[in-house]
Each structure stands twice: as structure tokens, then as C-alpha cells.
Amino acid sequence: RLESWAASPTDGDRLDCRATITVGGHDHALSARATGQLGALSAMLYDLGAGVEIHRLHQRHDGADVITILLCGNDDRQWWAVGTGADGDEANRNALIAGANLVPH
């Protein structure tokens, strides 16, 4: 579960991102620098052992909400994950967390 998220611009086109992610009842404070929020969150998830590859990304608007649909993968498996949010970045983060929750253990 993504408990908190913050992103701030840094050098070049990169972002410094900080998150608190709960896994198995334990909170993990993580940070990553990347060219976008999805890249940063992906790096954090790999650090937690829940790496997810994004094979496809689709977005739709539903009224004021944005819906992101991801085709995720890990090794030779693939699955779909969905997230919603007030903007594209929030919907992307929620979809990626949903995909990470489906990583086979």
C-alpha cells in the first residue's frame, strides 16, 4: 500500500521522489531520483523485491477522474492492473501499486 508520496523537481528533467510503502504490516520509507514518477516508483518497488515491468500503459478519462490500465509483467508472467486518480500521475502510481500487489511470490 502506498501510504504517502512526494515529488519535487531536481537537476535536469529529474524528480526526487519519496514514498512510504506498507508491505506485510511494515512501513518502508523510500526515495528515488528518476525522470518521472513511474520510474521512481518502479525503482522503489524493485528495492522492496516487488519489481514490476510495464509492458503497456493505457489511460482514459472518466469525468473528473483518470483511469490507468497497465499490462504488467515479472519474468515470464503478465497481468493487468488498474488504478484511478485525480490526475494521470496519481492514476499511474495507483495502477503500479495494484500491479505490485499481484506479483507472484
Task: Name each region found by the language model.
Residues 1-82:
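Terminal or standalone catalytic/regulatory effector modules within metabolic enzymes
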